[in-house]
A protein has these predicted regions:
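Active-site cleft segment of glycoside hydrolase catalytic domains centered on the general acid/base Glu
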Residues: 86-89, 116-229, 240-252, 260, ...
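Acidic (Asp/Glu)-rich catalytic clusters
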Residues: 27, 59-68, 92-103, 147-154, ...
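N-terminal substrate-binding region of glycoside hydrolase catalytic domains
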Residues: 27-103, 109-138, 144, 160
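Bacterial N-terminal signal peptides that target proteins for export
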Residues: 1-12
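Sec/Tat signal peptide C-region and signal peptidase I cleavage site
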Residues: 22-26
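Hydrophobic faces of well-ordered beta-strands that scaffold small-molecule active sites
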Residues: 31-33, 72-74, 104-108, 157-161, ...
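Aromatic-rich peripheral "rim/lid" segments of glycoside hydrolase catalytic domains that contact
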Residues: 43-49, 256-262, 274-333
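Bacterial N-terminal signal peptides
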Residues: 10-21
Length: 333
């Protein structure tokens, strides 16, 4: 009887492990979208609404799910004008995403507005703070927002500690090439994330995913400074006429980041001209094929604001028409 029980327990353990593995692999690559503008669009005059192919008004996240989307990315600002992308606005969108079964990525900008390679302006409330204080600011901000989400039933899978930080963050203290301080800021965000969501993966995100030399320079220096990360994030906005070349260069960079640093990678942002939907679909199909060929270290591809009406906020790389219907671009998902 004892031998039988041992054998039974071994078989049961193997079956459970297989089921767990199947559950993980079943999630597959994240086919995502940053939809942070949604509530602001709904509050515009007239409100921007979304329609299915039959012309019926519906929720954009449901439209996205219906074409194969399975993940949502949301940016967070510190004290934004109008409240867009603050904690409450973010929670509302996160709840809508969770209701559709989406995995969620949070994108912390450490600013009251846009942060990108050309500007990394500190939040007004943090101006004049020392490096020690800024580290506390970063930790408290991320820990506070994430705990707020968790307390409201939201599971976060990935957390970006900064947005397109090729030139650093929280200028001037964290501006490159001051990697000693920049590494501290990144680690403060990393530690805050793990304190709330131990299993969430922390992303360090740069623009121009095709630029392998810049990625090597940045992550070599960050590693030397003791910076911590789980995932290297990349933005990818290829020109319509040469997207094949840019996809080639992006793949080369992804493979190198995986090999050089033992890191997962994710395409945090991608987009192309909304009027070139067929070409965008081809580009995305190719990008997903390359990502799947690389393997499980490529975690996902996130289209940036596909919900943007043409020209909304000056952005023309969305994936809906002027009637709020999806173009064919996202059929790649």
């Amino acid at each position: 009887m004892t031998i039988f029980r041992r054998h039974y327990h071994r078989v049961l353990l193997v079956l459970l492990l297989c089921l767990c593995s199947a559950g993980v692999s079943a999630q597959g690559i994240a086919k995502g979208a940053d939809v942070s503008w949604l509530n602001q669009q709904a509050a515009s005059t007239p409100p921007q609404v979304f329609r299915d192919a039959a012309g019926n008004t519906t929720d954009f996240i449901k439209l996205f799910k219906d074409v194969g989307g399975n993940a949502i990315r949301l940016r967070v600002w510190v004290n934004p004008a109008g409240g867009w992308n603050d904690g409450r606005d973010t929670l509302d969108k996160a709840k809508r995403a969770a209701a559709q079964g989406m995995r969620i990525m949070m994108d912390f900008h450490y600013s009251d507005s846009w942060a990108d390679p050309g500007k990394q302006t500190k939040p007004a409330a943090w101006a004049g703070h020392s490096v020690t204080q800024l580290n506390t600011d970063v930790y408290s901000h991320i820990q506070g927002i994430l705990q707020y989400l968790k307390d409201n039933g939201i599971t976060v899978s990935w957390v970006q500690v900064g947005n397109e930080i090729n030139s650093g963050m929280l200028w001037n203290e964290g501006k490159t090439p001051n990697f000693a301080t920049l590494g501290q800021f990144i680690n403060s965000g990393y530690n805050a994330t793990k304190a709330v969501y131990p299993n969430a993966k922390v992303v360090v995100h740069l623009a121009n995913g095709y630029d392998n030399a810049n990625f090597r320079w940045f992550f070599d220096n960050l590693r030397s400074a003791g910076g911590k990360w789980d995932v290297i994030g990349m933005s990818h906005y290829p020109p319509v006429g040469s997207w094949q070349d840019y996809n080639n260069r992006l793949e080369t960079n992804m493979r190198d980041m995986i090999t050089r640093y033992g890191s997962d990678v994710v395409i945090s942002e991608v987009g192309m001209d909304w009027q070139q939907a067929a070409t965008t679909r081809a580009m995305l199909t190719n990008l997903l094929s390359r990502s799947n060929a690389i393997g499980s270290r490529v975690l996902g591809v996130f289209y940036w604001e596909p919900n943007a009406y043409p020209g909304w906020q000056g952005y023309t790389l969305g994936a809906v028409n002027n009637n709020g219907q999806l173009t064919e671009a996202l059929q790649a998902f």
